[in-house]
Amino acid sequence: MARLHSGKRGSSGSTRPLRTEVPEWVSMSAEEIEAKIVEMAKDGKQSAIIGNILRDMYGVPNVKLITGKSVSSIMKEAGFYAEVPEDLFNLMKKAINLRNHLENNPRDTHSTVGLKLIESKIRRLVKYYRGTKVLPAKWRYSPETARLLVE
């Protein structure tokens, strides 16, 4: 599979082992995991970071295998999931930081190209999320509204 904005191939990654039952070495129960997810969500952590913490510090290999629900669905049930999806939010944050950099360094052409690529990816994601009804049909990306959302 190729990279999105280059002709290069992507680096191959390892695949998650196929498991159907919970490993016996996992010490936390499903209720404890859900409580820990809600606790970390209250602290303002994103779902990807919560998954990494559960994996690295608590030895939980796969939340969905143990609880039957994903981290983001547990956060939605508890009311801690944002109205804008996390991948879109992170891209908007990246675009805002790049815009701030370009205000101070207007001749940085490489960053200008990078900003165009990031914003085209944002528009593609917005189109997808509008089609799947995650975002409202009239939701549009603009740098000003993104700055208000992120800050």
UniProtKB/Swiss-Prot annotation:
GO cellular component, one term: cytosolic small ribosomal subunit
Source superkingdom: Archaea
PROSITE patterns: RIBOSOMAL_S15 (PS00362)
Coiled-coil stretches: none
Matching InterPro entries: Ribosomal_uS15, Ribosomal_uS15_arc_euk, Ribosomal_uS15_N, uS15_NS1_RNA-bd_sf
Pfam families in the cross-refs: Ribosomal_S13_N, Ribosomal_S15
Presence of keyword tRNA-binding: no
GO biological process, one term: translation
One annotated GO molecular function: small ribosomal subunit rRNA binding
Keywords assigned by UniProt, alphabetized: Ribonucleoprotein, Ribosomal protein
Disordered: region residues: 1-20
Entries under NCBIfam families matching the protein: PRK08561.1
Assembly information from the UniProt record: Part of the 30S ribosomal subunit.
Family under the similarity heading: Belongs to the universal ribosomal protein uS15 family.
Name of the molecule in the record: Small ribosomal subunit protein uS15
Source organism phylogeny: Archaea, Methanobacteriati, Methanobacteriota, Methanomada group, Methanococci
